[in-house]
């Protein structure tokens, strides 16, 4: 039977393999030189060699960022599906992806800097707007979902208009970000994603047994001493922060928040006591694997969002047939 530590071990093994063999593989002698050079760099301030720079400044931050972003998106997806009692929602329902895309489009078209900052605010503000709209409309799950769909469509239209009017070079930059990419990863990006993961999921871990009760009706949750409206709003804020910070450094990477929670439920059931951690780890593994595929299937460094769609869409279709007994 699959255990959580099996997934964690798989993440570690895949990360090591990517570091060793990602791009061009290094010989044993070259690895010995890299290890010695890195040790001397930290102990004796020796200058890093070109191979050491490739490992430490290119491969390692990309691996770390893939793990962090994948965990944030998949964990956000499983929480969203639980609290909204809908297996077809993902973190981008709240307008996070379309809002981030609008922020990036404005950054590229107007200021040409601070892309991550505008992407974050573009992602977080629609989420707060959806929560405010839902409060006005009666705090129902249906109004929350519909508010998110409407706002996402509106923001996507605005971003599309900006992309239409800018020069082709800037439009191409917007499209590349829209498809999601880890090619320009840095340790600063890793820190941002880690902060989002920590701020979002430490509260969710502490409250996961209460969040389980949101899978029941609001009336049943109230009878068990849970305020469903308050708890659902808190969960959505946590999910929004984690997803917004992840999207701000990686672009919009689809399917992870939708597919991975379903895969995790096949092995761990619907109880968040085990499901939440397993979803985080599975999402981390999946995005790192997708990034490997994106780098190897063509001579070019494809946006990782293309790889997640290629891997995720057929697998999700298989899940649908499997659950219906087809």
Curated annotation (Swiss-Prot):
Membrane topology: Multi-pass membrane protein
Organism expressing this protein natively: Helicobacter pylori (strain J99 / ATCC 700824) (Campylobacter pylori J99)
GO CC field: plasma membrane
Keyword Isomerase included in the entry's annotation: no
InterPro entries with a match to the protein in the record: ABC_BtuC-like (IPR037294), ABC_transptr_permease_BtuC (IPR000522)
GO molecular function, one term: transmembrane transporter activity
UniProt keyword annotations, A-Z: Cell inner membrane, Cell membrane, Ion transport, Iron, Iron transport, Membrane, Transmembrane, Transmembrane helix, Transport
Compartment list: Cell inner membrane
Main location: membrane
Name of the protein in question: Probable iron chelatin transport system permease protein jhp_0822
Biological process, per Gene Ontology: siderophore-dependent iron import into cell
Taxonomic placement: Bacteria, Pseudomonadati, Campylobacterota, Epsilonproteobacteria, Campylobacterales
Chain's role: Part of a binding-protein-dependent transport system for an iron chelatin; probably responsible for the translocation of the substrate across the membrane.
Pfam families the record matches: FecCD (PF01032)
Similarity section: Belongs to the binding-protein-dependent transport system permease family. FecCD subfamily.
Annotated transmembrane regions: 7-27, 64-84, 91-111, 113-133, 142-162, 164-184, 187-207, 241-261, 275-295, 301-321
